[in-house]
C-alpha cells in the first residue's frame, strides 16, 4: 500500500500518465536490462571476443521536429549508441568503439509515437498472470476433479491433476500425461528428496510400483521416459545431449519460465520463500503444488477465480517495447556471429563498427509499430478520442483471447473491476467486454497489477481522512470499503448510519463504524468517457455505453460552444489532450497572429507555433485560434490558443440548442430527428473536413514518369487549376473530375497504332516514336473543395529511383443535412430526416422557434432519463446565464436531489426572466408550445430545453452512393459490394419477398436478371437503350443459377430441366 504523501487531499492524475510512465520505465529500466543480457560472442577458435559495455549507452536527441516527421513521412526516433569492445585473447589487446545500434521511436507529449509520419499508440493488454491456479470441474459422473494449472511467462500451460486413487499426473499434451514422480526426477530430484519435501509422502509411495521405480531410478531414465511421452516417440530412444536440448527448448523454456511476476505469485500461493531471481520452475515448486492439490482433494484450501483482477497482469508499453528490444538484440547477435566468422574466413581484421549493423533494431521496431495488433493508428477525431485511445485495455492480441473464443464470464463485469476498469465503457459488437477502459484514478503497479486509490479512516471517529492508499486487487479484499454512493465529498452530513460497502467481492450494508476505507470521488469507477455524462446515475448502463462511444465520434465544429450542463472534467480532458496551446513560461505577449505567438519572459523570447488547418487521420480539421492579445501578461499554464473542439480550455464537442420532445407528422419516427433550417444557415453544425490525395512518380522500364501541365486529349477546363509545373494551385476551388496533378507515363505503342507518317519516319531515320498515357491524379466523387496545401515529398539521400510523392490537401465545408447522424450524451442518437423552414417549426410562448424535435418515445423504453434532467437544466442555465458542473450520484445528499435541483433552477429562471411558462406548477418542466404552420397550440404540454447535442462523424456525404453500371464479380457475375468498389445494391431474400408482396413481377425480374448477373441480357439492354426498341425478355438462366448447377455437378449431382406436362407425370385419372 502506498500513500501519496498529502493527507486528506487528492488530485485527478494526468490522463496520459499511464503511457508516459510505461515509456519512462522502458527507457530507465527495460533498455538496460535487455542490453545487459547481450552475451559475449566468440569466434569458432575462441581467439576473438565481442562484448557490449552497457553502462555507456546513449540516446541522441532527434534531429527533426515532430511536425516535420509527420509531413515528410519520417519516424520521430532517437539513435541508440553503445560502447563495444573487441578483444584478441592471444595478444590481450582490446579495441573499443562507440557504435550505432539502431533507432528507437520516441514518445511525444500526447503519449504517442510517430512512425513513418503516422501517429501510433500502443494499447495496454490484460493477460493471465503467470503462477499456479487451482480449479474444480465435474466429470461425466458428477464427481469433482481438481486440477492445478501452472502458467508460464510465455503463456504456456502445465496441468497437474489428481485421479480417484489420489495419483497425481502432469499433463504434457492434450493426450499424454506422466507421473509427477517422473517429472520431478527429470527436473533433477531423486526419490529421497521428493519424499522429504512433500507433506503427504504416504500418498506418493502408494502409487510407486516397480515399473515406476525403474523409470525414476536415475535422472537419465526419467528424462527418456518424459521424452517418450512428450514427443510421442515409439521404441527406446537413446539418451544424448541433443535430446536434452530439444526438451529444454520445446518444454522447459516455454512452460517453465515463470518470470519475476510468476515467481512472486507462486511463492505467495504455495507459501514458499524461493529467491526472486529463480525465474524458472523448480522441483520444489512442483512438489509444493502437488501437496496443495492433495489438500484440495480433501477439502483444504480455496479455489481460484481466474477472472479476478489479482490473477491478471497488465502488459504495458514498457513490456512490449522491452520484448521487441530483446528480439532485435537476438537478431543482432546472429548477425555479429556471422560477420565474425566471415571476417576470419576471408582473413580480414574486424572492428566493432564493422561487426554491428543498425538494421535489426530499426526494422524490428518499425515492423512492431506497423504490424503488431496492439500498436494502433491514433484515433484523432476529437480531443476526447485521443486521450481515451491511450487508456484502453484489451484482452485481445498475442498471448490473449480472440473474439470468437472468449466466453461470457470473461466479458462480464467482475467485482474486482471496481475502481480499476470502467463497468460501462467498452466496445460494441463481437469485442464487447474484451476491450475496456481504465478508470480515472487507476494506475499500473510495479508488478503489472491495476491499483485503485482509497481513503483510510481513523479507527475511532471514522470522521477524518488520514491518507490516500493505492491498493492492488489482492489487497482490497480484506477491507470493508464504503461504496461509491456513500458520502465521499461532504464531511458535514451525518455518517453514523448504515452504508453500502464491499467486502470479499460481496456487496453488504454495514454500520459506518465498521468501514476501513472509502472511495475518494463519486466517479472514480468510471472511465473518462462515462465521467463526461451528466446525470449518468439516471441512465441505463447500455445507453451510457453508447454515449461513451459516441462522444468519441463527435466532429469538431467550426464554432464550438461550452456545455451548459457538465460534470467538471471537461477542462482536464482538454488540457491533457494537448489540443490547446498552453504557456510553458510566464511573460508578456509581444506578437500574435494565426501562425504563431511570440512571448517574452525572463529575458528570453519564445515563439510558439500554432496548428493551422491540420488534417487528422479521420479527415477532421485540427486548428488553433489565439485567445490572448498583444501586450497582455500571462502566467505559466495559461491557455494561449484554443484547439479543435475546445473553448476557453474546456472540451466543447457540440452545441446547446433548443429541443422539444414531441412527435411531428411522423418525421421523428424510429429515432429520426427533425431540425430547423437555422442550424444550416447560421452554421451551427458546420464542420470542416480535410482530405488528402497522393500520387507517386516512378521510373518505369520505358523511362521516368513526368509531372507536367501538357496533357494531350484532355479538355482545358479539367486542367484550368494547374500551374506551370502541372500541380494544382493553392486556393483553387476544385470539382469532381478535375486534374490535381498532371502526370504522363511513357509506354511503347503497338505497331498497328502508328500513323502512316510515323511508320515512314521509322523506316527512313530509324527513330523510335514513344507515346505516353495520362495517369493524372483526378479528384474523385464527393471530393469538391478548396485546395489548402500542396507538398512535394522526396526522401533525402535516396537514389534517383526513389519515388517522389505529391500530396494535395483539400478542405471541405460541410453543413448539416438530411442523413447526418446527431446524438446527445445519453445514448439518444438519431438521423436527420427533414430540414424545416424556421417559420414552420414549433415555437415557444416567447416566439422562439425550436431548433430540433426529438421523439418522446425514445426515452421510456431506453431508460435514459438523464437527458430530461439535462434538457430542463440547460434551459434554466441559458435563461440565467449559468453553467452547471454536476458530479454523478448527487442522491447521496438527499432523495430526489437531481429533480429538486432542476425544478429550483427552472423556478428561479421563471422568476428572474418574468416568464411564467418556464416553470408551470401543473406540469413542471413542460410548456405549451405552438404549431408554426397554423399558430394553434398543441394539445399537450411538451418538454422543452437546451441539451448538448453532438454531430457525429457518420455523415451522409461519406455514405451515400449510386451507380448505373460498374464492376462485376468474376465468379457470380453479380455487382461488387461497397462504395469503395463502386458496388451495387443487394436485393436479398427479404427484399424479394417485399416485391413479391406488391406483385411487381417485371421490376423483380429486372432486378434479378438485367441489373444483376444475366450477362447476355445486360448487353442487350445496353444495345436497345442506344438503338431504341423494346428490351427482349431473358430466356435462359442467370449466371448465379448456372454457378449452382456447376457446384452440384462437382458433387456428382446432375441437374436437368424439362417441360412439365400430364404426359411426364403419367397421371392415371381413374385412380385419382
UniProtKB/Swiss-Prot annotation:
It catalyses: RNA(n) + a ribonucleoside 5'-triphosphate = RNA(n+1) + diphosphate. Its main location: plastid. Its EC number is 2.7.7.6. It is an enzyme of class 2 (transferase). Pfam families: RNA_pol_Rpb2_2 (PF04561), RNA_pol_Rpb2_3 (PF04565), RNA_pol_Rpb2_6 (PF00562), RNA_pol_Rpb2_7 (PF04560). The keyword Chloroplast applies. GO terms for biological process: DNA-templated transcription. InterPro entries: DNA-dir_RNA_pol_bsu_ext_1_sf, DNA-dir_RNA_pol_su2, DNA-dir_RNAP_su2_dom, DNA-dir_RNAP_su2_hyb_sf, RNA_pol_bsu_bac, RNA_pol_bsu_CS, RNA_pol_Rpb2_2, RNA_pol_Rpb2_2_sf. One of its GO terms (cellular component) is DNA-directed RNA polymerase complex. It is found in: Plastid, Chloroplast. The keyword Nucleotidyltransferase applies. GO terms for molecular function: DNA binding; DNA-directed RNA polymerase activity; ribonucleoside binding. Keywords: Chloroplast, DNA-directed RNA polymerase, Nucleotidyltransferase, Plastid, Transcription, Transferase. In plastids the minimal PEP RNA polymerase catalytic core is composed of four subunits: alpha, beta, beta', and beta''. When a (nuclear-encoded) sigma factor is associated with the core the holoenzyme is formed, which can initiate transcription. DNA-dependent RNA polymerase catalyzes the transcription of DNA into RNA using the four ribonucleoside triphosphates as substrates. HAMAP family: RNApol_bact_RpoB (MF_01321). Belongs to the RNA polymerase beta chain family. This is DNA-directed RNA polymerase subunit beta. It comes from Lobularia maritima.
Amino acid at each position: 500500500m502506498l500513500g501519496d504523501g498529502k493527507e486528506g487531499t487528492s488530485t485527478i492524475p494526468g490522463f496520459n500518465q499511464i503511457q508516459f510512465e510505461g515509456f519512462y520505465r522502458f527507457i530507465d529500466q527495460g533498455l538496460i536490462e535487455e542490453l545487459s543480457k547481450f552475451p559475449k560472442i566468440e569466434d569458432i577458435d575462441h581467439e576473438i571476443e565481442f562484448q557490449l559495455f552497457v553502462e555507456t549507452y546513449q540516446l541522441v536527441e532527434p534531429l527533426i521536429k515532430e511536425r516535420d516527421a509527420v509531413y515528410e513521412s519520417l519516424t520521430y526516433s532517437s539513435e541508440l549508441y553503445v560502447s563495444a569492445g573487441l578483444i584478441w585473447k592471444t595478444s590481450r589487446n582490446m579495441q573499443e568503439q562507440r557504435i550505432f545500434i539502431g533507432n528507437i521511436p520516441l514518445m511525444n507529449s500526447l503519449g504517442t509515437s510517430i512512425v513513418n509520419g503516422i501517429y501510433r499508440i500502443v494499447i495496454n493488454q490484460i493477460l493471465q498472470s503467470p503462477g499456479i491456479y487451482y480449479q474444480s470441474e465435474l466429470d461425466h459422473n458428477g464427481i469433482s476433479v481438481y486440477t492445478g494449472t501452472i502458467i508460464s511467462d510465455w503463456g504456456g500451460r502445465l496441468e497437474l491433476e489428481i485421479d480417484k486413487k489420489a495419483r497425481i499426473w502432469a499433463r504434457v499434451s492434450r493426450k499424454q500425461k506422466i507421473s509427477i514422480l517422473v517429472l520431478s526426477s527429470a527436473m533433477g530430484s531423486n526419490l529421497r528428496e521428493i519424499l522429504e519435501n512433500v507433506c503427504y509422502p504416504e500418498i506418493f509411495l502408494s502409487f510407486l510400483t516397480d515399473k515406476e521405480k525403474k523409470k525414476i531410478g536415475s535422472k537419465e531414465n526419467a528424462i527418456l521416459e518424459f521424452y517418450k511421452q512428450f514427443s510421442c516417440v515409439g521404441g527406446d530412444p537413446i539418451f544424448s545431449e541433443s535430446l536434452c536440448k530439444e526438451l529444454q527448448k520445446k518444454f522447459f523454456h516455454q512452460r517453465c519460465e515463470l518470470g519475476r511476476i510468476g515467481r512472486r505469485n507462486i511463492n505467495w500461493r504455495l507459501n514458499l520463500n524461493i529467491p526472486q531471481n529463480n525465474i524458472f520452475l523448480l522441483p520444489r515448486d512442483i512438489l509444493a503444488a502437488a501437496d496443495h492439490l492433495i489438500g484440495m482433494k480433501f477439502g483444504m484450501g480455496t479455489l481460484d477465480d481466474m477472472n479476478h483482477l489479482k490473477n491478471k497482469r497488465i502488459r504495458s508499453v514498457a513490456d512490449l517495447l522491452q520484448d521487441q528490444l530483446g528480439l532485435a538484440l537476438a537478431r543482432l547477435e546472429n548477425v555479429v556471429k556471422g560477420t565474425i566468422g566471415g571476417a576470419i574466413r576471408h582473413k580480414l581484421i574486424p572492428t566493432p563498427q564493422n561487426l554491428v549493423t543498425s538494421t535489426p533494431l530499426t526494422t524490428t521496431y518499425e515492423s512492431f509499430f506497423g504490424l503488431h495488433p496492439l500498436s494502433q493508428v491514433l484515433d484523432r477525431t476529437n480531443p476526447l478520442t485521443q486521450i481515451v485511445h491511450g487508456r484502453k485495455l484489451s484482452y485481445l492480441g498475442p498471448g490473449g483471447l480472440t473474439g470468437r473464443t472468449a466466453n461470457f464470464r470473461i466479458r462480464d463485469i467482475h467485482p474486482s473491476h471496481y475502481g480499476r476498469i470502467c463497468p460501462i465503457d467498452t466496445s460494441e459488437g463481437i469485442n464487447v467486454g474484451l476491450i475496456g477502459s481504465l478508470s480515472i484514478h487507476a494506475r499500473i503497479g510495479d508488478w503489472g497489477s491495476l491499483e485503485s486509490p482509497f481513503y483510510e479512516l481513523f479507527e475511532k471517529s471514522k470522521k477524518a481522512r488520514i491518507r490516500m492508499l493505492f491498493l492492488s486487487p489482492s489487497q482490497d479484499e480484506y477491507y470493508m470499503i464504503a461504496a461509491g454512493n456513500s458520502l465521499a465529498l461532504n464531511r458535514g452530513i451525518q455518517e453514523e448510519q448504515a452504508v453500502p460497502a464491499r467486502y470479499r467481492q460481496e456487496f453488504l450494508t454495514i454500520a459506518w463504524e465498521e468501514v476501513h476505507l472509502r472511495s475518494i470521488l463519486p466517479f472514480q469507477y468510471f472511465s473518462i468517457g462515462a465521467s463526461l455524462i451528466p446525470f449518468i446515475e439516471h441512465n441505463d448502463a447500455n445507453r451510457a455505453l453508447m454515449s461513451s462511444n459516441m462522444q468519441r465520434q463527435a466532429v469538431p465544429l467550426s464554432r464550438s460552444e461550452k456545455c451548459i450542463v457538465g460534470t467538471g472534467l471537461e477542462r482536464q480532458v482538454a488540457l491533457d489532450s494537448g489540443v490547446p496551446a498552453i504557456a510553458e513560461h510566464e511573460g508578456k505577449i509581444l506578437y500574435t497572429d494565426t501562425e504563431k505567438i511570440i512571448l517574452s519572459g525572463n529575458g528570453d523570447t519564445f515563439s510558439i507555433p500554432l496548428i493551422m488547418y491540420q488534417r487528422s487521420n479521420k479527415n477532421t480539421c485540427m486548428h488553433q485560434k489565439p485567445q490572448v492579445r498583444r501586450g497582455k501578461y500571462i502566467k505559466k499554464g495559461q491557455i494561449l490558443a484554443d484547439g479543435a473542439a475546445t473553448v476557453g480550455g474546456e472540451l466543447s464537442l457540440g452545441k446547446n440548442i433548443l429541443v422539444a420532445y414531441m412527435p411531428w407528422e411522423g418525421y421523428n419516427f424510429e429515432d429520426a430527428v427533425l431540425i430547423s433550417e437555422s442550424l444550416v444557415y447560421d452554421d451551427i453544425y458546420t464542420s470542416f473536413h480535410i482530405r488528402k490525395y497522393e500520387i507517386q512518380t516512378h521510373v518505369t522500364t520505358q523511362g521516368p514518369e513526368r509531372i507536367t501541365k501538357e496533357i494531350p486529349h484532355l479538355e482545358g477546363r479539367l486542367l484550368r487549376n494547374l500551374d506551370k509545373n502541372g500541380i494544382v494551385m493553392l486556393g483553387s476551388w476544385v470539382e469532381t473530375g478535375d486534374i490535381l496533378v498532371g502526370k504522363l507515363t511513357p509506354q511503347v505503342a503497338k505497331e498497328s497504332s502508328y500513323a502512316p507518317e510515323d511508320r515512314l519516319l521509322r523506316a527512313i531515320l530509324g527513330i523510335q516514336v514513344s507515346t505516353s498515357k495520362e495517369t493524372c491524379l483526378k479528384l474523385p466523387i464527393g471530393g469538391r473543395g478548396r485546395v489548402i496545401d500542396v507538398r512535394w515529398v522526396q526522401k533525402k539521400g535516396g537514389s534517383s529511383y526513389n519515388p517522389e510523392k505529391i500530396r494535395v490537401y483539400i478542405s471541405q465545408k460541410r453543413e448539416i443535412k438530411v442523413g447526418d447522424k446527431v446524438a446527445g450524451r445519453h445514448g439518444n442518437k438519431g438521423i436527420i430526416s427533414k430540414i424545416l423552414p424556421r417559420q414552420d417549426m414549433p415555437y415557444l410562448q416567447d416566439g422562439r422557434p425550436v431548433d430540433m424535435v426529438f421523439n418522446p418515445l425514445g426515452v421510456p423504453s431506453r431508460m435514459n432519463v438523464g437527458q430530461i434532467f439535462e434538457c430542463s437544466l440547460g434551459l434554466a442555465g441559458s435563461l440565467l446565464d449559468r453553467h452547471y458542473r454536476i458530479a454523478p450520484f448527487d442522491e447521496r445528499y438527499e432523495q430526489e436531489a437531481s429533480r429538486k435541483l432542476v425544478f429550483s433552477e427552472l423556478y428561479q429562471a421563471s422568476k428572474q426572466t418574468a416568464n411564467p411558462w418556464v416553470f408551470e406548477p401543473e406540469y413542471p418542466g413542460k410548456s405549451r408550445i405552438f404549431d408554426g404552420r397554423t399558430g394553434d397550440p398543441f394539445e399537450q404540454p411538451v418538454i422543452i430545453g437546451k441539451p448538448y447535442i453532438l454531430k457525429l462523424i457518420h455523415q451522409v456525404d461519406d455514405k451515400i452512393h449510386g451507380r448505373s453500371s460498374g464492376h462485376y464479380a468474376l465468379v457470380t457475375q453479380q455487382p461488387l459490394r461497397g462504395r469503395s468498389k463502386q458496388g451495387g445494391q443487394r436485393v436479398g431474400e427479404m427484399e424479394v419477398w417485399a416485391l413479391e408482396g406488391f406483385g411487381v413481377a417485371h421490376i423483380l425480374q429486372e432486378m434479378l436478371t438485367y441489373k444483376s448477373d444475366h450477362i447476355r441480357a445486360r448487353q442487350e439492354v445496353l444495345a436497345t437503350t442506344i438503338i431504341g426498341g423494346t428490351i427482349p425478355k431473358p430466356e435462359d438462366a442467370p449466371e448465379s443459377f448456372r454457378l449452382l448447377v456447376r457446384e452440384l455437378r462437382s458433387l456428382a449431382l446432375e441437374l436437368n430441366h424439362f417441360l412439365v406436362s400430364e404426359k411426364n407425370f403419367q397421371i392415371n385419372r381413374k385412380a385419382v
